[in-house]
């Protein structure tokens, strides 16, 4: 799996794009299986780095979504309310929320695509 080089990643398997969109990685959606429900915050909500901001429910489990950065939610991907399976189809295009960062330096704490790919492979036992 190729992870977009312009995204930053967390060890909890979330990504953030340069424009502040947040989603889960292909590795995460593959581990979860068929996603049937996504719970997201409302526009205007504040999220805090490392804290849960929603959840993803699959046929296997419910998993919390952890904020890679702190910020204010400026948009929510409403498509996922009716078609959560889009996360399985293309995890790196199916963003969940868009945020306005309150502390852009938090991006420096995140993993590059190459580092995340190595981390995900080690976690999977490869």
Curated annotation (Swiss-Prot):
Name one cellular component (GO) term. Answer: cytosol
Question: Is Membrane among this UniProt entry's keywords?
Answer: no
Q: Which domain of life is it from?
A: Bacteria
Q: Which Pfam families match?
A: GCV_H (PF01597)
Q: Which residues form the Lipoyl-binding domain?
A: 19-100
Q: Which UniProt keywords apply?
A: Lipoyl
GO BP field: glycine decarboxylation via glycine cleavage system
Textual note on the cofactor: Binds 1 lipoyl cofactor covalently.
Transmembrane residue ranges = none
The record's annotation in SUPFAM superfamilies points to:
Single hybrid motif
Task: Kindly list the positions at which N6-lipoyllysine occurs in this protein.
Answer: 60
So which cofactors does this thing need? (R)-lipoate
Q: List the disulfide bonds.
A: none
Q: Which PROSITE patterns match?
A: BIOTINYL_LIPOYL, LIPOYL
Instruction: Cite the InterPro entries for this sequence.
Output: 2-oxoA_DH_lipoyl-BS (IPR003016), Biotin_lipoyl (IPR000089), GCV_H (IPR002930), GCV_H/Fam206 (IPR033753), GCV_H_sub (IPR017453), Single_hybrid_motif (IPR011053)
- Describe its function: The glycine cleavage system catalyzes the degradation of glycine. The H protein shuttles the methylamine group of glycine from the P protein to the T protein.
What subunit structure does UniProt give? Answer: The glycine cleavage system is composed of four proteins: P, T, L and H.
What the record says about family reads: Belongs to the GcvH family.
The name of this protein is: Glycine cleavage system H protein
Q: Please report the organism this UniProt entry assigns to the protein.
A: Koribacter versatilis (strain Ellin345)
Gene symbol?
gcvH
């Amino acid at each position: 799996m190729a992870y977009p080089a312009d995204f930053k990643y967390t060890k909890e398997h979330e990504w953030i794009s340069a424009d502040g969109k947040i989603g889960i990685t292909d590795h995460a959606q593959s581990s979860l299986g068929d996603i049937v429900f996504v719970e997201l915050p409302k526009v205007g909500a504040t999220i805090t780095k490392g804290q849960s901001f929603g959840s993803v429910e699959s046929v296997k489990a419910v998993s919390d979504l952890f904020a890679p950065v702190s910020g204010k939610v400026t948009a929510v991907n409403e498509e996922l309310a009716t078609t959560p399976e889009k996360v399985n189809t293309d995890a790196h295009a199916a963003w969940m929320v868009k945020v306005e960062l309150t502390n852009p330096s938090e991006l420096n704490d995140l993993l590059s695509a190459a580092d995340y790919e190595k981390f995900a492979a080690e976690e999977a036992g490869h």
